[in-house]
Amino acid sequence: MAAGSTGERPFFEIITSIRYWVIHFVTLPSIFLAGFLFVSTGLAYDAFGTPRPDAYFQASESKAPVVSQRYEGKSELDVRLK
């Protein structure tokens, strides 16, 4: 081992190894697919508590509500949603 070496394999050697690609050939698409399903099924909205795209506005509204009082904004929106 050379002086100053940490004993780790060089990055180029890792990404050119067959073992790296055998492992990542399965894991990388799996992570992408899991993320796609997490978002497309709506589970992401439930997990993070964000409103779904169709819940931002009520059917009778055509634009975003305007909050007039800075510190009472939440109560204004709560009244609007009732």
Swiss-Prot record:
InterPro entries: PSII_cyt_b559_asu (IPR006217), PSII_cyt_b559_asu_sf (IPR037025), PSII_cyt_b559_N (IPR013081), PSII_cytb559_asu_lum (IPR013082)
GO terms under biological process: photosynthetic electron transport chain
Cofactor note: With its partner (PsbF) binds heme. PSII binds additional chlorophylls, carotenoids and specific lipids.
Localization of this protein: Cellular thylakoid membrane
Entry GO MF terms: electron transfer activity; heme binding; iron ion binding
Membrane topology (UniProt): Single-pass membrane protein
Pfam families: Cytochrom_B559, Cytochrom_B559a
Transmembrane segments: 22-36
GO cellular component: photosystem II; plasma membrane-derived thylakoid membrane
Gene3D superfamilies according to UniProt: Photosystem II cytochrome b559, alpha subunit
Known role: This b-type cytochrome is tightly associated with the reaction center of photosystem II (PSII). PSII is a light-driven water:plastoquinone oxidoreductase that uses light energy to abstract electrons from H(2)O, generating O(2) and a proton gradient subsequently used for ATP formation. It consists of a core antenna complex that captures photons, and an electron transfer chain that converts photonic excitation into a charge separation.
Oligomer and partners: Heterodimer of an alpha subunit and a beta subunit. PSII is composed of 1 copy each of membrane proteins PsbA, PsbB, PsbC, PsbD, PsbE, PsbF, PsbH, PsbI, PsbJ, PsbK, PsbL, PsbM, PsbT, PsbX, PsbY, PsbZ, Psb30/Ycf12, peripheral proteins PsbO, CyanoQ (PsbQ), PsbU, PsbV and a large number of cofactors. It forms dimeric complexes.
Protein name: Cytochrome b559 subunit alpha
This protein's encoding gene: psbE
